[in-house]
Amino acid sequence: QGFARALVTNVLAGGVEQGASTVNQQYVKNYLWLVDAENEEEASAATEQSIPRKLREMRMASDLDKTLEKDEILTRYLNLVSFGNHAFGIEAAARTYFDVSAHELNPAQAALLVGLLQSVEGLNPYTNPEGAMQRRNTVLNNMAAEGYLDQAEADRFAGAPLGILDKPRTLPQGCITAGDKGFMCDYALRYLADKGLDLDTIQSGSYTIT
């Protein structure tokens, strides 16, 4: 999680400050759309292309820096942002593309996912593997330049295949509305699965928490 946050901070296009501003605005938009909206009308309003909506997002994004640490904003952003193929949040993305948990991502996998944030449709590794690999390798080189990897490691990971699943894993979106608690929500679901309660059973059953 911390590694992914560092990636977002340092390699988003446009530099750290511009990237951080973009993170704030995208987090606000995703929060209003995926968490705060209680019906289709509110969800539509959260994503409409209008100047008032954009100004509201910019104002709310600016206010975030006054109430939350940048690390907390990045964590919340990573828990809600779309990585394409119906994967919202870094945990869902790790499982959708690699069938691993976010904390198990290696640098090449993390770089691929972060690279997708530039254009989740245009850099979809299933429809544009060459573009996705080129972007991944750019991120790896940026990681080396920022000191998160040495250049030899970056070159080694850049020479590796994408390593994605044959087809994206389809996941239920049960943790989207958990917002900034997405990691804990996913942990709870995996814990219950280890105890014999699969997600289908959890979603369809009625349980009493005592």
Can you say where each PLM-predicted feature lies in the sequence?
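Peptidoglycan glycan-strand catalytic modules in the bacterial/periplasmic cell-wall system
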Residues: Q1-D150
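Extended, non-catalytic substrate-recognition/exosite surfaces adjacent to catalytic cores, especially
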Residues: I51-R53, K66, K70, G115-L117, ...
